Amino acid sequence: MFPTPLTAFALASFMAVVASSVNGSGTINFGSSVEHLSVRVSGSSGRATFEDKAAGGNVNGQIDINCVNIAGNTATLSGLVTHSNKKSMIGQEGVFRIVDNGSKKATPDMASLINFHQPGTSTDCNAGEFDLTPVKGNFTIQ
């Protein structure tokens, strides 16, 4: 049998490995833009897909998430666009925020549109202001 201090240390170490996650999908309407977003993130990496229907045309693609900042029920995520039907977006950084307000029957979850920019020219998941709007869908932040 392990001495008590070693057992407590082992238990604390095991509990510290629990990774955060952000999962779900939803559609937001923001002005004339309708954006559908799906997210699957565990720890500090994962993928997000987007479909944006706007007056300027339809754009879709995938973001490889490499930065995740979770504070309570709010997650700010960023990463690089790796696929898109608009080739000029590939290599750009996308950053967005999601707020998990509980189950679908509770207050709707919130999300921002994805803000795209050249890497290093604006904020990543560690900063930024976001206009949030209600989501038709459900996101889970753990």
PLM regions with names:
Residues 1-19:
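Sec-dependent, cleavable N-terminal signal peptides
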Residues 17-27:
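Boundary/junction segments of secreted and surface-exposed precursor proteins
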Residues 85-89, 95-117:
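Extended soluble regions of mature proteins
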Residues 24, 53, 65, 101-102, ...:
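Short linear motifs in intrinsically disordered/low-complexity regions
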Residues 30-98:
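Predominantly extracellular/secreted and cell-surface proteins with exposed
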Residues 20-22, 42, 75, 98, ...:
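Compositionally biased, low-complexity repeat tracts
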